[in-house]
Amino acid sequence: MYIAIEGIDTAGKSTQIAKLQEHFSDAIITKEPGGTEAGKEIREIVLNAKIKSKKAEFLLFLADRAEHIQEVIEPNLSKMIISDRSVVSGVAYALVQGEISETAILHLNRFATGGIYPQKIFLLQLTNEELSLRLSQKKLDGIELRGIEYLLKIQDALIKASNLLNIELVLIDATKNIDSITQEILNNINI
């Protein structure tokens, strides 16, 4: 089963993936962007705000996604795969940027993934207040520097992207305690 943990920055994706790894010790744990060597370099370029063009950023993420699907996801489809972000994030960010048509976004992502999508998305949702608090407690990267309003638009776009891609979506209140969130995810994984 291929699942992805989605959510805006600080929602707790990494924490939940670490908890899930305790329950699925043989799972393939990966992330997008950055799940391959090429992806790590692409992630570094984007997070350090080295790319100014939103179209160039979109194309870099597509390149990472294609490589990630070919090198990590496709060879392991018979195993449990848990990904920190997925095609859903790529579509959501592109929708919010608004520089590329929805049709083109979906077509290019379908091309990059070969139609291989997670079977289920777990979206960790934050309130405006909780997001403000969490962001105030860390050094912000290039994407987080775009602001709270931008990140909340991304959160809404993650829901839209899941629907556009016809991927089953489980919404989770990320303000709950860590163990409650983990249990909710486990209850919704059908193996």
Curated annotation (Swiss-Prot):
Which InterPro entries does the record cross-reference, listed alphabetically? P-loop_NTPase, Thymidylate_kin-like_dom, Thymidylate_kinase
Where is ATP bound in this sequence? G7, I8, D9, T10, A11, G12, K13, S14
Top-rank taxon: Bacteria
| Reactions mediated catalytically | dTMP + ATP = dTDP + ADP
GO molecular function terms listed in the Swiss-Prot or TrEMBL record: ATP binding; dTMP kinase activity
Instruction: Mention one GO biological process in which this protein takes part, according to its record.
Output: dTTP biosynthetic process
Keywords in alphabetical order, please.
ATP-binding, Kinase, Nucleotide biosynthesis, Nucleotide-binding, Transferase
Q: Which Pfam families match?
A: Thymidylate_kin (PF02223)
Top EC class per UniProt?
transferase
What's in the GO CC field? Answer: cytosol
What EC number(s) does this enzyme carry?
Answer: 2.7.4.9
Cross-referenced SUPFAM superfamilies = P-loop containing nucleoside triphosphate hydrolases
- Please give the function described in this protein's UniProt entry: Phosphorylation of dTMP to form dTDP in both de novo and salvage pathways of dTTP synthesis.
Q: Which family does it belong to?
A: Belongs to the thymidylate kinase family.
Recorded hits in PANTHER family, A to Z, give:
THYMIDYLATE KINASE, UMP-CMP KINASE 2, MITOCHONDRIAL
Identify this protein by name. Thymidylate kinase
